[in-house]
Structure formats: structure tokens, C-alpha cells
Regions:
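Alpha/beta-hydrolase active-site loop
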Residues: 94-121
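Short beta-strand element of the alpha/beta-hydrolase
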Residues: 40-49
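Short beta-strand/loop motif that positions the catalytic acidic residue
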Residues: 174, 180-182, 186
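Acidic catalytic loop of the alpha/beta-hydrolase fold
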Residues: 161, 184-189, 216-217
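N-terminal cap/lid segment of alpha/beta-hydrolase-fold proteins
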Residues: 1-38
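Short alpha-helix in the alpha/beta-hydrolase fold that links the catalytic acid
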Residues: 59-60, 142, 166-167, 176, ...
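Primarily recognizes the serine-hydrolase "nucleophile elbow" in alpha/beta-hydrolase
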Residues: 112-173
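Short amphipathic alpha-helix adjacent to the substrate-entry channel of hydrolases
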Residues: 56-77
Length: 237
């Protein structure tokens, strides 16, 4: 992990951008941690949605809530064909980014490499995953193979889309506690497909949180409560 910016502190949260190499791919990311940080190793992995990136406003909000309110560090990396992985001035093409059969395996490898490097910097501790929409397309296959992830927040996704085959395989292998967010009037992911994905998750400790509204209309209060959920597992001594 190579730092690409100097640390910037705002309202008691330190932010630093980084890059790392994984299987010849450059992986751009950001780390957030409390200004007065130790090395307790508590870490959340933040996966952004399609057409977004590692610095999207809701990702920043989640990272800052975790650091400021719970003392938890977090990292985010740009997903396939998004953010700094694109050429300057280009817009993300969701279908093109996920067209290759190996896309899921590659982004899972990138996340595991980022976790390895983050633990060198932060120490080894409890790890959570937080990701909605495309973040769930990535997070479920990741949690299925990564035993360091002890709790996860998923949602806004179902057995639908370009990696649904991988989701069907991975979902039963996810055994950590899960909170799953579902927008009842989702115009992108059919409700029944989201319910099918929730039902398929192998975790014996899972909760479904449904809210009226369209795909991107998750209330900020629900977003904030999702960080409290992660902290309830990460902050147990």
C-alpha cells in the first residue's frame, strides 16, 4: 500500500488516499480513521454502488460516522470500471465493467489485497463489510471466502444482474451476521429478487430492513443506523 496523498484531518477524522497493486491491477483507495488513532485493528470495508466511486457522499458519510462515533477505521476502493480506474473524463459503464467472466474474482482479490495491506497499517482486529447495490454484488462473494469478515451490511441487490450466477453460489457460504436493506419500491432490482437473495444467505443471524421508496432513496437515518449495527459487533471486547 502506497500513500498517494498526505493525511488530511477534518472534524476529527483523518483521510489518506492510497494505491496498491494486485495481479498487475492498480487498486485506488482511501483510508479513514479517527484523528487520535491507535492500532486496535477495527476496520470496515466500504463498497460503493454502480455509477458511484470511493468518494461518493454516502460513502464519506458512513466512513466519518464510523470513525467519529465509534472509533472504527475504514477503507474504500474503486469498483470495476469506476472512479480512478477509469480514464479522466470518462463516465462509468456498468454493463461493460461487469461484462467479463472474471470481474467478480478480480474485485474480490483486490479487496483481499487491500485488507491485507490495511491490517499491516492498522493492526489485526475485527473486520466488517458495508456495501449496497454494486457493493453487495462485490461484498457477498467477498464475505463467502474471507473469514476475517465478522459482520456485514448488504442490500439493494438480488438474484438479478450481471453476476447473479456468482451471487447464487456465494450467498449460502456467507455465515457472518448480516443486516440486509431493501427498498420496497425499488425500480431497478425487483423486490422478489432481493427477498430471494436475503433468503439464500447462509447466516443464521440475519435481519431484513425494508423501507418504502425507490432504489436510491434509502433514508440517511437508516444509513447511520447501519453503522451502529456494524459497531455493535466490532466494538465488543
Amino acid at each position: 500500500m502506497k500513500w498517494t496523498t498526505k493525511p488530511v484531518v477534518s472534524r476529527k477524522v483523518e483521510e489518506t488516499e492510497f494505491e496498491l497493486e494486485c495481479e498487475s491491477r492498480t487498486v485506488p483507495g482511501i483510508m479513514w480513521r479517527p484523528e487520535k488513532h491507535g492500532e486496535n485493528g477495527k476496520l470496515a470495508l466500504l463498497g460503493h454502488g454502480g455509477a458511484h466511486h470511493k468518494r461518493s457522499e454516502y460513502v464519506l458519510a458512513v466512513a466519518r460516522w464510523l470513525a467519529r462515533s465509534h472509533g472504527i477505521a475504514s477503507i474504500a476502493i474503486d469498483g470495476p470500471g469506476h472512479g480512478a480506474r477509469l480514464g479522466e473524463g470518462l463516465e462509468p459503464d456498468f454493463s461493460e465493467a461487469w461484462d467479463a467472466e472474471e470481474t467478480t474474482d478480480n474485485i474480490v482479490a483486490d479487496w483481499r489485497a487491500a485488507l491485507d495491506e490495511a491490517q499491516v497499517k492498522l493492526g489485526v482486529g475485527t473486520v466488517a463489510y458495508w456495501g449496497l447495490s454494486m457493493g453487495t454484488m462485490i461484498g457477498i462473494p467477498l464475505a463467502a471466502v474471507e473469514p476475517r469478515i465478522k459482520v456485514a451490511l448488504f442490500g439493494l441487490m438480488g438474484f438479478w444482474g450481471l453476476n447473479q450466477k456468482q451471487l447464487r453460489t456465494a450467498a449460502p457460504l456467507v455465515t457472518c451476521p448480516v443486516r440486509f436493506l431493501l427498498q420496497w419500491d425499488d425500480e431497478i432490482v425487483p423486490r422478489e429478487r432481493g427477498l430471494m437473495l436475503f433468503d439464500a444467505l447462509g447466516s443464521k443471524d440475519k435481519v431484513l430492513h425494508a423501507h418504502m421508496g425507490l432504489h436510491s432513496a434509502v433514508p440517511m437515518t437508516t444509513m447511520r443506523k447501519s453503522t451502529v449495527y456494524l459497531a455493535s459487533y466490532l466494538c465488543v471486547d
